[in-house]
Every structure is written in C-alpha cells, then in structure tokens.
C-alpha cells in the first residue's frame, strides 16, 4: 500500500509537460480562459489579466443557491483553475505599462477581444511583436482577425450558426432549428487555439520567433462538424445534407425515446449492442428478420 501511494504521489509531484512555459491570458467568458486553462492543466505558469470590471463569466453563473456573487460563478471557476491573477486597466498608461511588462516576461499571450479593441489599446500583434520577438499570440474571436465579419461582435451562438452546423445538427427535419446546449464554438475555438499555440511555442526556433495564431470559432466548428459532410459535397455536386433530427441514420435505432422515469438515449450500433437491445425488448420475433441483422440494413429499413 505504501509503495503504491508513494508511486502515485511521485507522479502527482512531477512537473507537467508545459512546465516552464509562461502564459498571459487576457480574455473573458469561455474561449480564451479555457484555452489558457489547457495550458495551466499541463503545467504552464498562467497569469490571468482582468479589466477592473472583471471577467464577464463572474456575472454569468451558475451560482450556489442562485445568488449572484463575483467570487462564486461556476462558469468562471471551471475555466480558470490553476492560474494566478491580476487586475489591470490597459486603457491607462500605467495599466498598459504593466501589461507590456508581462508580455516581455511571457512566452504566450491568449486573448479573445475584438480586433479593433486590441488596436485601440495598442495591444494588437503588430503593436506588441517588437516587445518580445519570441511571443506567441493566440487570438480567438468568433470570426477571425481578417475577412468581412472580423469587426463584428458576436457570441458563441453567432459563431456556431454562421458555420452552417445547425442546418444539420440542431433540431428535427421540418421543424425550427434549436440552440445547442453549451458553448460549443467557444470550446472548439479554445482547443484549436491551444493545439496550434503549443505547436507555435515549440516551433519558435524553426520559424525564427513568435507568431500570431488567428483562431475563428466559426471556422473551428465548420471544420469539425460541417467539413466532412457538407463542404466537399456542396463544392463538387451542389449537395448538402439536411437535418436528420436526433440520432444517427447509420446507427438505427439511435434516438431519444420516452421511458417510465423520463427519457433514454438509445444507440445500437455494434452487434453486441443490438443483441443487448433485443434482449431488453424480450427477443421479439421481428428482430430475427434478415433486414435487422447488421447496421447497414437496419439503417435502410429504419
């Protein structure tokens, strides 16, 4: 027992894979904070910079007993673990000087402010790259740093639906599309930013210094959810898949069904899953028909 405990303790005390990497996070809500949390989870030293009003997630909740409190927001806590913090008003000369001092120290800056706002603060990549030539800047916005929508303010829902993903995944055929249930575009943008940002950090010696990693949350969703199904088909044949509703056509039966104590998600894709479902249903005779013996014929006859 003592040997096992010692081994676990030894693993816990080892530095993370990103130990020694210094990160400044200057973001709000989800995309930049979660991206920075991925760095901190792997051992990077992350300093979160908040404007005097604080991260908007502090006011978003959820809160214990539904009582709003700036220090008790669940959304803020989940995306900001393992970080140090400082308040800094970058709109003032003293605040900007402090922020620039942090940039000179850092390997990475992660931010999700509007491009025009960063330019107004003189903190856009063109303005700060000379401060620290090895600095990697990860800018995560709904629509990217360039293009027709780059100057537009937007939120997770705007980025998600602009990608076209909701035309396939949100709601049932013939009905109004639905909102997705979480900050999907922001989280996918954050993961994309962390992945390419870490590559940029470790590639600095190859490219001769730092660089800007420009992440569009809408494009991250389009690449993950829309690309394989729709972009190629539309480009080649003018065809795109419509909404299929809940479930997977190839995985029939795959859907949400009412049951005695609520609802159940059912997916019987593999042979073992199908046989288990048959058993739960009492092995009805119709389940022995040839058309139901593999997932392809089940899908064709669903």
What function would you assign to each model-found segment?
Residues 1-206:
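N-terminal helix-loop segment corresponding to the beta1-alpha1 unit
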Residues 53, 142-144, 217-222, 261-263, ...:
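Glycine-rich beta-alpha junction loops
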Residues 76, 241-249, 254-256:
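Short Gly/Pro-enriched turn/cap motifs at secondary-structure boundaries
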Residues 163, 190-211, 223-236, 278-285, ...:
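Oxidoreductase and adenylate-handling cofactor-binding alpha/beta cores
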Residues 174-183, 205-221, 243-249, 290-294:
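Conserved Rossmann-fold dehydrogenase catalytic segment
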Residues 252-302:
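Aromatic-enriched alpha-helical interface/lid elements that frame and gate functional surfaces
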